[in-house]
């Protein structure tokens, strides 16, 4: 069946910090997918991405390039970028009509219910359009806790949520 949307994981792109190359890819993607929604994601190394480690200023610059290009419908902003950076990037995205997915990934464990709840609440309060957490369960109970937090927060928050239990 046909895809509902496309996500470009730019951290896999060799020229990710070359503005012209990034704009060429975004423009090509838009021509290929037409009006299908496009999510642009640069996953940092600390959040499990394929790119080399980068500074916060390089990360912010990439996000602003993508927003300025106008081809992405949604942009992924990492919760770990911090409150001040997130606020600046969310404001820029919304001013350009770009929706924001705020994401957080824990590759070691499933955090406590309180931590997962606080992260999702923080994402919603920041102005993110969609909150996303991905965790690493070590038991069926961990997966059940994630589902319970997701159900509880879906009822409490106005923004949609994406949650996932990762693993092999």
Task: Give residue spans per PLM region.
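Active-site beta->alpha loop and helix N-cap motifs at the rims of alpha/beta catalytic domains
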Residues: 1-95, 99-112
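Catalytic alpha/beta core domains of metabolic enzymes, predominantly
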Residues: 74, 79-168
């Amino acid at each position: 069946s046909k895809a509902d949307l496309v996500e470009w994981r730019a951290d896999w792109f060799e020229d990710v910090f070359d503005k012209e190359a990034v704009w060429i890819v975004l423009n090509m993607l838009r021509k290929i997918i037409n009006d299908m929604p496009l999510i642009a994601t640069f996953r940092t190394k600390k959040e499990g991405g394929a790119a080399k480690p980068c500074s916060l200023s390089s990360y912010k610059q990439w996000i602003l390039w993508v927003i300025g290009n106008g081809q992405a419908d949604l942009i992924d902003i990492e919760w770990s970028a911090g409150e001040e950076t997130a606020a600046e990037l969310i404001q820029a995205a919304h001013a350009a009509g770009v929706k924001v997915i705020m994401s957080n990934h824990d590759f070691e464990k499933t955090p406590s219910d309180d931590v997962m709840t606080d992260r999702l609440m923080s994402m919603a309060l920041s102005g993110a359009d969609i909150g996303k957490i991905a965790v690493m369960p070590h038991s069926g109970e961990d997966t059940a806790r994630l589902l319970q937090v997701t159900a509880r927060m879906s009822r409490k928050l106005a923004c949609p949520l994406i949650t996932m239990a990762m693993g092999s």
